[in-house]
UniProtKB/Swiss-Prot annotation:
Zn(2+) 2 binds at residues 151, 158, 170, 175. The gene is SINAT3. It comes from the Eukaryota. This is E3 ubiquitin-protein ligase SINAT3. PROSITE patterns: ZF_RING_2, ZF_SIAH. It comes from Arabidopsis thaliana.
Amino acid sequence: MDLDSMDCTSTMDVTDDEEIHQDRHSYASVSKHHHTNNNTTNVNAAASGLLPTTTSVHELLECPVCTNSMYPPIHQCHNGHTLCSTCKARVHNRCPTCRQELGDIRCLALEKVAESLELPCKHMSLGCPEIFPYYSKLKHETVCNFRPYSCPYAGSECSVTGDIPFLVAHLRDDHKVDMHSGCTFNHRYVKSNPREVENATWMLTVFHCFGQYFCLHFEAFQLGMAPVYMAFLRFMGDETEARNYNYSLEVGGYGRKLIWEGTPRSVRDSHRKVRDSHDGLIIQRNMALFFSGGDRKELKLRVTGRIWKEQQQSGEGGGACIPNLS
């Protein structure tokens, strides 16, 4: 269910197309190297040190079915063809190369070879300089600061990943998200029938401020038996960078107001995770209707806010924004 209308004004109140076009570049994911299944009895050659490069050994450790790196237990057929434990279950105990029965033979030699390897992070092309022992690399890659970001759009199961400039352009071009420049904002959310609340009626706006991008979320959902409205901000970057910023949200009317102040969450945290943690401005429906005039016929919420940067310890100019919440 969509909100009937949404108006937004910001400090500069201009679309940030030029800034985005300057930042945008094609985000190329690292494609996996496919090869024919030569990882047969060459395992013995690897174990005896006859293979010339680490790359050759790394190719032996690539599962011929899913092309992912193999981790113990590594299985092999009677002819020496190897595959990972996940794919063993998928191929119904038949070797995908020679079609012979797999059995329960482990390739201990290849597992031992893997222990001696040190390999770069798979996000090396994105800037990660780290090198890890083979069995430690996978754990690092799940939390690597250089790993791609997921699309922060909450209205669909979007599987797009990329760096921040790529995702900003993706949100604008593919999801038609509103883009604004400035560190203060003024939103008006209008809904004709406030009694109808489904999981989840929501809006998303992207702001460009201090050279960074922020996602402002506003949505209605059921919290227990009661419908609520929630607004929160996410920083398009890592958590350590997000801590450099603060934001405030204010909603009110008829002599009453609610104010929320906090640190934006990183888009590394999913939209649902932030929402379910209640880390934002939460407005109960009765209060929302009071702010709207109390006639309970139409929801009219005006949410204002600002983003500011903590002053630098080194004395550098923080460039704090002047609030404009009138």
